[in-house]
Amino acid sequence: MITRDFLMNADCKTAFGAIEESLLWSAEQRAASLAATLACRPDEGPVWIFGYGSLMWNPALEFTESCTGTLVGWHRAFCLRLTAGRGTAHQPGRMLALKEGGRTTGVAYRLPEETLLWKREMITGCYLPTWCQLDLDDGRTVNAIVFIMDPRHPEYESDTRAQVIAPLIAAASGPLGTNAQYLFSLEQELIKLGMQDDGLNELLVSVKKLLAENYPDGVLRPGFA
């Protein structure tokens, strides 16, 4: 599992598995992206980020406040080819991002600093950090940084049908564990928070069926939870 100490000390070239050198962003590129994002800040209020995937259950960041909320206009989609972390170039999986349309519930965090966040999320620059309005469940509306999939990125995948991506997620694994573990952690966190994402239902059923067929005795690969 990713921790704050892991992120602080991680060498991005090796810590998450083998990443194609042409895709890997340097510390300078990440710093420039962060500066450009903050320069577009729509107000002088605190900096919030919106977690819709692993940021929900394992932010690995210091934050001063958190609150559940809803992002309108975007929906979860496993549209990022996963070749590190929980997948490899030879056995790629799929990672979560956001695509236009619909709505997404998640967790917003108010951050005291953002540098480590960029190291966590922007290793290959696959996202477009975008300021969006969030409707928090306590009644507030805040501007937050949301990591939206960049469709121009080489690892963007447009086909997110369950029958296409379920076999990939069921099979992929890497230094951080299995791809299925990520999907099931998302399912558990949504249940814990009383949230529902109907777009995940078919995918969850398909991945669980594939794992049951491949591991009939319930013996799963290391890292599965």
Locations of regions flagged by a protein language model:
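A glycine-rich, hydrophobic/aromatic-adjacent loop/helix-cap motif
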Residues: M1-A225
